[in-house]
Regions:
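Peri-membrane helix termini and adjoining interfacial loops of integral membrane proteins
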Residues: 32-39
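Membrane-helix boundary connector in multi-pass membrane proteins
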Residues: 88-109
């Protein structure tokens, strides 16, 4: 196994951890927003729910990207749509960061998901280049 494939596998394993963390934090925001609803104004309430939805999407896409990355690290011909999903994770993670200035913890986790997805996309391209040699 080459260094690029090992790095793709390590990044994919880290993505699984951050996908679970992002999903847990998004579910905490979902559970907490009805309790805060009486104390907060409507735009803040809606932004918190929108952010929780975006972070849930990021979590599921990150998990899918991680599974594709692990399979692709073991067998590079199985990378499939990993690059496309990694770009989608990066875009969704950045969107979640933009829409959630109030919820700092969730923004940080989504930003780390986006950074890991960009790094996984870079190593995806390197592993694909190894196949073509």
């Amino acid at each position: 196994m080459s260094n690029n494939r090992k790095m793709l596998k390590v990044l994919s394993l880290a993505q699984i951890v951050f996908a679970v963390l992002c999903f847990v934090m998004a579910s905490l925001v979902f559970n907490g927003t009805p309790r805060v609803g009486g104390d907060a104004d409507v735009p803040t309430f809606l932004m918190a729910n929108l952010d929780a939805v975006l972070c849930t999407i990021v979590a599921f896409l990150t998990a899918f990207c991680a599974i594709d990355g692990i399979k692709g690290a073991n067998r590079p011909t199985a990378l499939g749509a990993h690059l496309v999903v990694a770009v989608l994770v990066a875009a969704a993670g950045i969107a979640a960061c933009v829409f959630s200035p109030a919820i700092q913890g969730l923004s940080i986790v989504c930003a780390l998901d986006a950074v890991l997805a960009i790094a996984a996309a870079v190593f995806d391209k390197k592993v694909r280049a190894e196949i073509d040699r």
